[in-house]
Each structure stands twice: as structure tokens, then as C-alpha cells.
Amino acid sequence: MLSNPFHDLYLSEAISEDALVEIFSPIIVELAGAVFESGNVIVRGLQGTGKTMLLNLLRPESRIAYRKAKVKFPIPKEQAKFIGGGVNLRKCGALEFAQHLQTDSDERQVKELELLFADFINYWIVSDILATILKFSETADELLCSEVGISLDPERLKAFAEAFSTDDCWFGVHPRANSVQELQASLASRIGWYRRFLNLNIDALPDEILGSKTVIGDPILKVAEALKSSGVISDSTKVFVRIDQYEQLTTLNVAGTQYGDACQQLIHKAIGARDGRVSYRIGTRSHGWPARPTIYRTTDTLELKRDFSFLDMDELFRRRENVRTWNFPDFARDIFARRLRAAAFHSENSIRKNLLAEALKDTPKPQERVARYVSQSSGMDIIRREISGLENVDAGWKNYIQRLAEDDLLSAWLACAWVRQKSAGSRRKSGGLTILPPEDGRPWKPYWYKERIPLALMQLASANRQALAWSGEDEVLNLSGGQILVFLFLLQHIWDAWLRDNRGSTVEALKFPIPSEVQSQGVIEASQEWKAKQIEGPNARQRRVFVDAVGRHLYRRLINDKAMSYPGANGFSLRVDDLESDQRLVSFLCQAVGYGDLYEAPHTSKNPGEIRKKYYLAPILSPVFRIPSVHTKEPEYINIGQANRWLLGEEQQGASDSATAEDGVQGKLFGDDA
């Protein structure tokens, strides 16, 4: 039976450490060096940008798996001297504390639950750090332990266990331990009580636990200190503490409380200790980290660069104007090859330099796309209709466009747009049509033509009632928007379409490249499903209404722009001053960006001194809305009135909201030098 190597989108979170060695891409390490240096780092990004994959490298199981596989550990040796422990808040059970919240819970009860959360996290992380020591010790690999800076001396391990088990951070609750295993068992017993409590198997925790709650972060600092003072780890060995799925804590704001916010503030308190003994690594979605990270039960906040720094996975792989600085393609190509190798798909070919290009081929050239959208005879009919609609244009220009269409339908369509722009010269100082170009020449400058190709292809396909085609390596990478999850999601659907197209075949019969029409079908299905699953997070329904309204508006705006005056109108731009006057809209747009519905960037306005922000729909939504995914020229200038109408699902823009009515700028952007 044919299988899909991309069936499991979250493979790096579900497989064993041994398999992780095979599919993990070291490219991400080269770009994320800050994660392996001292200091607190917030690793944030949209779903599926590689946060958990990166944090998993800090786990001892990953380090040991690389050693067993005789594969070089991807972290440079000078940065790889560390141990650590961590917690995944979704998996450890901490989110179940909210089950004990009641609408009639008084302040004291809520506060005690907050401090119990802190104690639970302390115990879990310290237990995981001890587990790390034991895992390295059990390998009996002296060279590996030397690289990490761990001593296997039993006397040192015993001295550590004796001293740390009786440290005052525990409030005297643990007996003196003679070994790390004994101390680990004592911690596990306490965690076991918490599990029974969280699962409602007991009504209350024992008084011994209630009377010995630890201070958030304190035992974590003490375990790092004790490990070094006893010689179990070297003074130069870094101690990293991982806390993943941080954004999940806000889901605990239930029963009329802000319990989840308080739990986040407790974590902020641990980070804000400004103590170099440990370095925190917080994994969170883009929307998860608060603008003002308040410290628990204070008005104080963490300071960027002093208390923490960001590693923004979205920015790491975001496409810039200079495509040569775009890191995502190499990362995606490596992941693609590793997935195929792990699935043993044509394994003899899976080490080629660019297997993705072999599978998807180059993105079709514009002329090839035109041939797919429209036949020559149908294209001539379409151009004739366009010519007949040109007003105040002399016969010479119409004949020129007609002759152009015989050899180049795309240029003929663009010529109609160029003529429309120039024939509107009454609104321009030097308007009007110029002299006819020579038979083999074109009236426009090269950049004018290049910037309008995506819009021309969209309009030509629509004129012949054809769907836009989506295929080729560059196209798929662009639609991925720098997100590895979206990339894998697209490949999953492309592969499914390919398997359907080869029903009854053996895996050996599947040969690259995947046909363009099959790729396009898979991309469209992926886009439709991605839009349908837009149900996560707060305001999910309103975000979906907004995205639908924006998508419909942008499509109609582009289709109706026959003069192609605004080829960049597959996005929109708002004045920052206007946004600051509408905090409700700002909050909504931040949520939409945080959940990946929109992409936001600073916008250099054509108005001197004006500060704006521009927004685009996530590229993967382009196929479902039938709009180009490439961002060229200026986005549509709108005001907050239009944006608020989109919140209500209204897409029609009134004259008072248009860019030209607002500031009179966009009409000047495509002037007489075209």
C-alpha cells in the first residue's frame, strides 16, 4: 500500500529520540545560536515553526541518541556543554489545576492554588534535572559525560544527594537521601500526590504538602548550585530550564478568575530572579507572550534584553526583499529530503542535493501559465473583447494590441491595461498615449511589466473562467510563508493527490516530478482545509469573518482593476496614528497576526513622515481566495472604518474610505514613467 511520508505533520513531537536524529535539520541550529548561550530566551513563533523541535535538542535523550547513532551533535562543541530539565505544560498535567477553581472560590483559595502550581512546576523541573543526571550516568560514556561536564564519581553523586535533599528550599519535608535515586523517588512521591489531586482522586492534598510549598524557581536555582558545588557538573556547564506550551496557561482564566495569568506571572518571577545559575527557555506561540510580562503579585515587569531576549521563529524564516537572505528554502529542502529518507522512499536518491526541485520542478513561466489558462483562439476572443472596451483609443493602438495577441497573449492583456492607464491622462500632468512602439517593441519599462504579471495571470484566468494553477518549488515555498508546518501541510496534500492519481501502482512506479496539475490540485485542497480549520483561539469566529471579508474584497478589487494601477492590492495598509485611536481593532489585528491569519510588517508610506503598517493574508490562503501570493508594489491604503466593516463581514468599500479619498496618494504611485 502506498503511504504518505508527510502524513504526520508533528512527527518531531511524537517520535523517539533515535528517529529524531534522522529527521532533525541542523540548519535550524545554525540560525538559533542564542538558545544555546547563557541567559533567558523566549522562543516564540506560530504553530509549527520548529519551537519544540529546537527545545528538544536540550533534552539528554536527544544528546544520547546522536551519540548512539554516531551522528555529529548539531550544536557546536563550544556551545554544547550543558544539562537541563523541563516541563511541557500541556503534557505534565499542570493545566488540570483549573478543575479546582469554583465561581465561589475566595481569594485565599485561588492564591493557594496559584502557589500549588508553582510548587508542582518546581518539583517537576527539579525531578527532570535529576533524571538528566541519571540518564548521562547510566550511559557510562565517559567521553560524552566529559563533553557535557558531568562527573560519574559515585561519591560526588552521593554528596550532592545528601546536601540537596536537606536544603532549606524544601522546608524540611525530605529525609536525607543517600543517592540521587533516593532523592528522585522522594520527589516522585510528591508529584504522585499532585497527580491524584489533579485527577480528582482525592479531595485535598495532605497537610504536609500544603505546609511546605516551595518558592517558584528557588529549588531550581539550588539544584544547579548543589550540582556544581559537589562537583557533579563542572562550573562551566550551563543549566537550561525548558518550559514549553507557555501560551496554554491563559486557558486557565476560568470561573471568573485570572488564574492562568497568575501562573504566567509566577514563571515571570522565576525568570526575573536575574540569577545566572540557570537559564530559562520558554516556548510559546507568537500571541502567547504578553506585551507587559508582569511579575507575580507586583506591578514590576520583566525587561527585554535585561531579563530575557526573544528568538522569533517567524522572523527567522520570514522572506525579506533580498531573497538571498531568505533562510527558509534550505531548511524546507532539508526537511523534505529527511522525511523521504525516513520513509525509505526511493532511498537511493534521497541524498541528492535538491530533491525538492526534482519532485516539484521549477515554477511554470508566465507564458506556460497563460497556455494552461486559455487556448490561443479563446485568448484572441478575450483580447478582442478587451480592445472593444477601450474608450478614446485610436485604431493604431488597437491594431497594435491585436497583432501583439497573435504571438503573446500575456503582453496583449498587459498592453490593454497600459493603454487604460495612459488614456486616463487628463488626471495627470503629462498624461495621454505616447507614439506607437515598433512592432517588436513594448511601450512600458521592464519593471512595470514584471510587477503586473501575477495580476495579469489572475485576470486572464478569470476571464476564461479558469482556476489559478499552483505548482513548482518556488510556488510551494512561497505559499508556505516561512512556516515548516504549512510547508509539510502543502506536501501532505500534494502527495495525497499524487497517490490518488497513481491508484494501483507500486511505490517503485512513483517517479519524480509530480505532475503540475496534480500539485495544483493538492495545493488548492490544502488551502481549503487550512481555511476550514481556522477555529482556534479567542475570537476565532470573528477572525474567520474578517478573513473571509478581506479575501473577497481583495479578489474583487484586483479583478476589477483593469488598468492594473494597484497590482499590490492583495494586502492593505493602515495609518499607525489611526490604529492608536482604536485599541479594539489593534487588539484584534494582533490576535489575527498571532494566530497566523495575517502577516504584519512596517510600511514605508509614500506620504512623507507618515507611519503605516501593512497586512497580508497568510500566503496559504491565496489559492482559496484566488489572489496572487506574491507581494508587489503598494498595498491598498484603507482607513479604520473599512477595517471595522470587515470585522462585521462587510466587504464593500465606500468612496469615503478609499485610499485616494483618504490621502490622494495611490493615484500617483504608477505615474508617467511606466
Tell what function each PLM region has.
Residues 90, 215, 375-674:
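C-terminal leucine-rich, beta-strand-based interaction scaffolds used for sensing/assembly
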Residues 219-240, 248-466, 473, 516-545:
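The catalytic "switch" region of P-loop NTPases
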Residues 21-40, 104-109, 218-225, 259-266, ...:
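Short linear interaction motifs
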Residues 56-59, 126, 261-272, 337, ...:
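Short, well-ordered alpha-helical packing segments
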Residues 1-101, 115, 582:
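Walker A/P-loop-proximal flanking segment of P-loop NTPase domains
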Residues 54-55, 96-100, 250-256, 289-296, ...:
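A short acidic (Asp/Glu
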Residues 55-236, 309-311, 317-403, 407-409, ...:
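P-loop NTPase nucleotide-binding core
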